[in-house]
Amino acid sequence: MLLLTEDGIIAARDRWGRTPIVIGKKDGAYAATSESSSFPNLGYEIDRYLGPGEIVRLHAEGVEQMRKPNEEMQICSFLWVYYGFPTSCYEGKNVEDVRFDSGLKMGQTDTSEVDCTCGIPDSGVGMALGYAEGKGVPYHRAISKYTPTWPRSFTPSRQEMRSLVAKMILIPNRAMLEGKRLLFCDDSIVRGTQLRDNVKVL
């Protein structure tokens, strides 16, 4: 939660730290956001992450702690796996780096025989790139995402609309798919809508 006051901004993180708040700093200014990806183009550097339940006041002179953080944290793992933008960092861990490392470890240990690996965009791509490196196989962009007119497939309230969005948002490339043993990395774990449709297409 962020509150704008006459003498600064009060930033408060939820008691369990499930969602992040990160403080950015540049000459003569501080900023607070839930996504560190908003900082680079504005000239801010990450200064610190608020702890669970921590409250601070930001002003031009610095950061004043109003409440100390709780000891226990229950941050949402979906931030790295699903929701997070690739350039964002949560608790000092970059989203794309976590996805890549997860795929890398799978590729190093998986015994499946595959010709190439593919990622279901967007968040499955980082994991697939890591898998390809760990497995020693090429990465192919066999499914592309068309986003100008469609929201995230898990957000519509009706299943009929979720299924339509999932179907229309991803376009398979037959030239990259046909005759190949493919391994797909997918993050369709909220409702599983895209996973079911992609299996049918393949």
Question: What label would you give each PLM region?
Answer:
Residues 124-125, 195:
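Generic non-transmembrane alpha-helix signal with a bias for helix starts/N-cap capping motifs
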Residues 164-202:
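PRPP/pyrophosphate-binding module of the type I phosphoribosyltransferase fold
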Residues 1-124, 132-167, 172-173:
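N-terminal segments that mediate ammonia production and transfer
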